[in-house]
Amino acid sequence: MSGDIAKGKKAFVQKCAQCHTVEQGGKHKTGPNLWGLFGRKTGQAEGFSYTDANKSKGIIWSEETLMVYLENPKKYIPGTKMIFAGIKKKTERADLIAYLKSSTS
């Protein structure tokens, strides 16, 4: 399922930007900077303090893993500090993932 980058950017601004940045060299906020997200293992953004749950999950971020994670983060990684409840609509998750893919590499 391919998403709409413009809609994904809007979703990022509304739901994610309070805690995350996407640009290369962007600062960590409450959540880590997301530059280089795709292909990276959970809990590996340099200079960010992760929970053991994030560090030990050991999955690689991809369109597929993000699709599941973003639906219910606490179910996918029990013990994560991310307090975001998740995005129930699959199309909205696809849009957000399309935006993240275009803006984090």
UniProtKB/Swiss-Prot annotation:
Binds 1 heme c group covalently per subunit. Keywords: Electron transport, Heme, Iron, Metal-binding, Mitochondrion, Respiratory chain, Transport. Belongs to the cytochrome c family. It is found in: Mitochondrion intermembrane space. Heme c binds at C16, C19, H20, M82. InterPro entries: Cyt_c-like_dom, Cyt_c-like_dom_sf, Cyt_c_1A/1B. The keyword Transport applies. One of its GO terms (cellular component) is mitochondrial intermembrane space. The keyword Iron applies. Disulfide bonds: none annotated. SUPFAM superfamilies: Cytochrome c (SSF46626). This is Cytochrome c-b. Electron carrier protein. The oxidized form of the cytochrome c heme group can accept an electron from the heme group of the cytochrome c1 subunit of cytochrome reductase. Cytochrome c then transfers this electron to the cytochrome oxidase complex, the final protein carrier in the mitochondrial electron-transport chain. The gene is cyc-B. One of its GO terms (molecular function) is metal ion binding. It comes from Takifugu rubripes (Japanese pufferfish).
